[in-house]
Amino acid sequence: MENSMKKKKSFKESEDEELRRGPWTLEEDTLLTNYILHNGEGRWNHVAKCAGLKRTGKSCRLRWLNYLKPDIRRGNLTPQEQLLILELHSKWGNRWSKIAQYLPGRTDNEIKNYWRTRVQKQARQLNIESNSDKFFDAVRSFWVPRLIEKMEQNSSTTTTYCCPQNNNNNSLLLPSQSHDSLSMQKDIDYSGFSNIDGSSSTSTCMSHLTTVPHFMDQSNTNIIDGSMCFHEGNVQEFGGYVPGMEDYMVNSDISMECHVADGYSAYEDVTQDPMWNVDDIWQFRE
């Protein structure tokens, strides 16, 4: 019995020594891609062996999901995606794979990196817990309005966001959480924009949106004809004026672009992020 155990241990150690470590080669990428395209995903240890790769199953899984899978989206997370991550994390915590299911083309690793290098680090800079009510207040008061403003800038020049009302009055604007609809769209579909009341102020109704309660303060919303509307006063420009904070100015010489790309830096100073770069967030510090 003891000899048998020793042989198994020796065989396993020999296998481990043969496994490749370090960066993947083009040849390995090609082998893995061709195998999965012909046979599909499966048990990753089996995939590694059948594809002729001297890699662990875990290494193959991460390589495929994070780099080789054809439908992976590259580049910066959009404001819509950032808003959705904030909302879903408030519901599910660090369940990155589950959150990734609602962001087509984004990987759980990318979402986790965004949370750790942007959100958690900002909470640490404020000296508060990232899952605390105080931090959610900061998110609701400063980050969410700027994300909504960025969404507005990316779509068209509008002054009011609206979405169909459901049972929750306290909510963020979020893409519909229907798996079918989300899997079909790369970004939120804005084709359903229309005016609400026909007045001179422009209103924008986002199609394929739902409401999920958490961040948005009800006092900042109005219900018009069964719709949830977020008005111009609640959506401030980056580097601009924040209602009730007249004594504080945003540092305007910071770039307005929010770079949330593949190359996250653990040493990046997120206080320079225009989403947060407002002097009046001092009130949220401990």
Swiss-Prot record:
Principal place of residence: nucleus
GO BP: cellular response to phosphate starvation; gibberellic acid mediated signaling pathway; gibberellin biosynthetic process; negative regulation of DNA-templated transcription; negative regulation of gibberellin biosynthetic process; phosphate ion homeostasis; root morphogenesis
Reported induction: Slightly induced by salicylic acid. Induced reversibly in response to phosphate (Pi) deficiency but repressed in the presence of Pi, specifically in the leaves. Availability of Pi increases with decreased levels.
Subcellular location: Nucleus
Alphabetized InterPro entries for the sequence: EOBI/EOBII-like_plant, Homeodomain-like_sf, Myb_dom, SANT/Myb
GO cellular component: nucleus
PROSITE patterns noted in UniProt: HTH_MYB
Domain of life: Eukaryota
Domain HTH myb-type: 16-68, 69-123
Tissue/organ expression: Expressed in leaves and flowers.
One Pfam family per UniProt: Myb_DNA-binding
One MF annotation (Gene Ontology) recorded for this entry: sequence-specific DNA binding
Gene3D superfamilies given in the database record: Homeodomain-like
Annotated DNA-binding residue span(s): 44-68, 96-119
Keywords: DNA-binding, Gibberellin signaling pathway, Nucleus, Repeat, Repressor, Transcription, Transcription regulation
Classification via PANTHER family: MYB TRANSCRIPTION FACTOR-RELATED-RELATED (PTHR45675), TRANSCRIPTION FACTOR MYB62 (PTHR45675:SF30)
Protein role: Transcription repressor of phosphate (Pi) starvation-induced genes. Negatively regulates Pi starvation responses via the repression of gibberellic acid (GA) biosynthesis and signaling. Modulates root architecture, phosphatase activity, and Pi uptake and accumulation.
Annotated protein name in UniProt: Transcription factor MYB62
Organism whose genome encodes this protein: Arabidopsis thaliana (Mouse-ear cress)
Gene giving rise to this polypeptide: MYB62
